[in-house]
């Protein structure tokens, strides 16, 4: 569903992909695209990333979407920066429900799905940020691919197998 779809955990990967099944687990078909992530992606950071898109795309006509999503983004930013609190999680849920129920268009009505679904399925990652004030995922160094010039012949055969898509040309 992209930025206005929900984030679902691996336990739901075997459900048939159709409108009703996705809605039942807190997601939606959206544009029909799927983004697959792994254990190196912090779902709190992903929810923030998707909400940034929504804030940018809001037309500003209705207050819930125009102001509510900005408030949610401020809260998520605090949480990602390990400065949030348990009360922020409750506030996110309240804002998300209000925005979903009172926005005038589809963007506002679906804008909070990534936050709602990550709070539901990846709550432990939020708790790491607000209770431990340290996210083991965000604070881990992401892999930095390197090419060994002694082994690389420049043929490009390994390009399609590089998980980081670091090999170009």
Segments predicted by a language model, with ranges:
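Short Cys/His-rich zinc-binding micro-motifs
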Residues: 150-154
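Iron-sulfur cluster-binding cysteine motifs and their immediate structural context
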Residues: 64-70, 157-169
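Redox cofactor-anchoring modules in respiratory/redox and cofactor-processing assemblies
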Residues: 1-144
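Acidic, Ser/Thr/Pro/Gly-enriched interdomain connector segments
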Residues: 145-149
């Amino acid at each position: 569903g992209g930025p206005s779809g929900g984030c679902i955990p691996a336990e739901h990967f075997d459900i048939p992909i159709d409108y009703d099944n996705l809605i039942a687990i807190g997601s939606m078909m959206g544009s029909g695209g799927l983004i697959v992530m792994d254990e190196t992606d912090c779902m709190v950071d992903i929810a923030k990333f998707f909400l940034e898109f929504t804030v940018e795309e809001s037309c500003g006509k209705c207050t819930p979407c125009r102001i509510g999503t900005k408030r949610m983004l401020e809260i998520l930013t605090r949480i990602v920066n390990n400065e949030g609190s348990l009360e922020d999680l409750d506030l996110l849920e309240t804002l998300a429900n209000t925005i979903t129920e009172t926005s005038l268009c589809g963007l506002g009505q679906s804008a909070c799905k990534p936050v709602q679904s990550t709070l539901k399925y990846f709550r432990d990652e939020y708790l790491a940020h607000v209770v431990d004030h340290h996210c083991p995922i965000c604070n881990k160094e992401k892999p930095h691919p390197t090419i060994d010039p002694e082994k690389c012949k420049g043929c490009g055969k390994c390009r399609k197998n590089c998980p980081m898509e670091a090999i170009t040309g």
